[in-house]
Amino acid sequence: MPYLDFRFPASLAPSSPTEMVSATVNEAEAHRFFSAHCFNRAWDLIRKSNRTTIECEQMLQLSQASLWHWTQRSDCTTKNLSIGNWQLSRIYALLGQAENALRSARMCLHYSENTSPFFIGYAHEALARSAAVAEDDVGKAHHLAEARRYLARIPDDGNRAVLQADLESLEGEAAA
């Protein structure tokens, strides 16, 4: 029985990934598009309450792809890397992967060091969430306290409210 050959005919396939990208858009535009598009699609899946196994895998892959595309952008900042690692940590926490969540949360804190209290507070939120997944009550309490310390220093009411809500949801998980 012959097998199915799913390869493109040579006449249809680009000779390189660069040729494929440059045929329609340039690389910078592609990275710009996919860094945001993949982040937003991952975020949609984070918010979804009943994800399938496939959607969980897609959520992780989209976040990883987004972060990689950010690293390829000439305008990538430490804030972008902080946000990307925060999202990745959140996803690993949702998937119950404590060690991966912690690694990404530590990267988030690293990239947040010289940014605003909002980003540092969220890095500690990610560290607290990963500690919760690891059942590390001491680490969770420490990073919740740190996040609250930075929360008090956030000047924007809207940003402060967003972090406050995430901290309360995390604190509520212990009470549930």
Residue map of PLM features:
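"A position-specific structural signal for the A-helix of alpha-solenoid helical repeats
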Residues: N40, Q87, A126, L163-L170
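Amphipathic alpha-helical segments of tetratricopeptide repeats
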Residues: Q64-T71, R106-E113, E146-D156
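Residue register of alpha-helical TPR repeats
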Residues: A36-H37, L81-I83, Y122, V162
